[in-house]
Amino acid sequence: MKEYSIGTKCVQAGYAAGNGEPRQIPIIQSTTFKYDTSEDMGKLFDLEAEGYFYSRLQNPTCDTVARKIAAMEGGTAAMLTSSGQAANFYAMFNICECGDHIVASSSIYGGTFNLIAVTMAKMGITATFVSPDATEEELNAAFRPNTKLMFGETIANPALTVLDIELFAKVAHEHGVPLIVDNTFPTPVNCRPIEWGADIVTHSTTKYMDGHGATLGGAIVDSGKFDWMAHADKYPGLCTPDDSYHGITYAEKFGKEGAFITKCTAQLMRDFGSMQSPQNAFMLNLGLESLHVRMPKHVENGQAVAEFLENHPKVAYVNYSGLPSNKYYERAQKYLPNGGCGVVSFGLKGGREAASAFMKALRLGAIETHVADARTCCLNPATSTHRQMNDEQLKEAGVPAELIRISLGLEDKVDLSADISNALDAIK
């Protein structure tokens, strides 16, 4: 559906009903699938034929939604996972192994920071974290001979820094490695990282894509542009025979358009299991169908609240790239011309005590760990999502102790501003 707009892809990509078939995608709630002969099933296990044999690896409902997300991002292949964390782990571990190295932006979601800095380190995969504002020279200096990928978030959670995707992609490609970008906050409605040079795009579909706080999920999209065989020495998992699949070499058999997702499905999903359920995929698709309508409203509310907060005497600073005063405004105009998202972060004069009083006084904004929902919610990340970080790490990640992250939902912006104003008045 390359010729169609993003809105049309949100509604119709991935599934075309045949004559007399369901207009809505079917939920294939089955663990397994029947075949007439052992030979037919054997072809699936040999990756010689397309089809399904066990829903831990693939399911028709999940594949339908994955195809839609691939079309929305402009990729050649995609897969769903059980969560955004699973998507990021699979995307990185698919091309990394013990002894390898990652270069990652320091301004990322706390759970992802911990995944890279602690959990993957236990697997023998080390990382160097760089500022999202690092110069080309500084980025180059972070590379080692064993570096296998770069990672960053289009809009960081919760610092809301904006990644210079084009620069990160340029440096990554000069070193012969792919750039993986988590595009959760802007969604492909507001930014498509592949158009700026990213090779792999990940999502927590739990957020805006679902949009209603109803289903957990993640997604990985492959651009199909990175030439794995041109860097075969770096990526033996893709470019040498896989003994667990009869000696298949993924990059040779499936080409650069299909090797990454095929290996991720056939190998990692087989061994680790984190597949999204068909029911969750169905509900995710319902969210995707209205994503292009919802995102402008989230951006509108985010912009209105950011402007209100910027002029309030009890607010020390506001992080929102839609504000002309924001350090990322010019970069956002490049990558996010239609706006980024509905998430605003800000610091209150008075530190943690003021933050606590503010959140306690909110009526429309619920205190919860979720973000990017139809309903407004808020959080103090230093005491919740990022509490595993020490003070130095919090500073590097752009998450000081007084920071509040507020995710503006789809309520009326006048009511939201009034509620926030009343909560600010409660600070003594």
Model feature map: region roles:
Residues 74, 146, 314-317, 402:
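Glycine-centered tight turns that cap/initiate beta-strands
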Residues 221, 345-347, 407-409:
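Short hydrophobic/aromatic beta-strand micro-patches
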Residues 32, 223-226, 348-351:
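Short loop segments at secondary-structure junctions
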Residues 7-16, 78-311:
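Conserved PLP-enzyme active-site core in the AAT-like
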Residues 1-59, 67, 404:
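N-terminal "arm"/small-domain region of PLP-dependent enzymes with the aminotransferase-like
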Residues 37-89, 111-119:
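Conserved N-terminal alpha-helix of the aminotransferase class I/II PLP-enzyme fold
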Residues 272-275, 279-281, 286, 290, ...:
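Conserved small-domain helix->loop->beta segment predominantly found in fold-type I
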Residues 117-118, 126-127, 141, 145-148, ...:
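PLP-dependent enzyme catalytic core of the Aspartate aminotransferase-like
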